[in-house]
Amino acid sequence: MYKRQLPLDLLEKAGPLSEEEYKTMKTHSELGYERLKENINISSKTKMGVYMHHENVNGSGYPLGLRGDQIYMFAKIIHIADVYDAITSERPYKKAQSPKEAIEFLMNNAGKMFQPEYVKAFITYIPVYPKGRNVILSDGNVAVVVENRQYHTLYPVVRRLSDGETIDLAEQNENLSEPLSILDFER
């Protein structure tokens, strides 16, 4: 949020950031807040969400090093969405990772970086594999996602393209010792 106020060469740098560059990058939360501060059409909760969206629930974030309940709820929500977007987006310095990898990162960092119940809500309602998207199954077949289930976002219903068979990956995951899973999106 508000990273566009930072120097373009910093945003597009292909390699790792120096300590000074990282320090500059971390100012975007404050820059965004300063830009919104005087706007009466934007709620104070939204402004504080922008300011605090890099705070981690364990206190290791920035700009203030807040923890737990010191962080506005909206900031905790923005933080999850921002990290998900960062992981799944192509950047000059890294390739995009799959939604599954992003969800796994969020789940592995619930309670450290993220409020656990917000991570749970996010992965419950955000489909990891969008309907209509072709995916590669663990058996090497390509399938299309035909349905997402609210509480099984990592295991949608798919239709295998080779034979048209519809497979409920959530059901398979619960009932088979070696269930099919999705390895990646078809590129």
Label for each model-derived stretch:
Residues 3-187:
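Histidine- and acidic-residue-rich, metal-dependent catalytic cores
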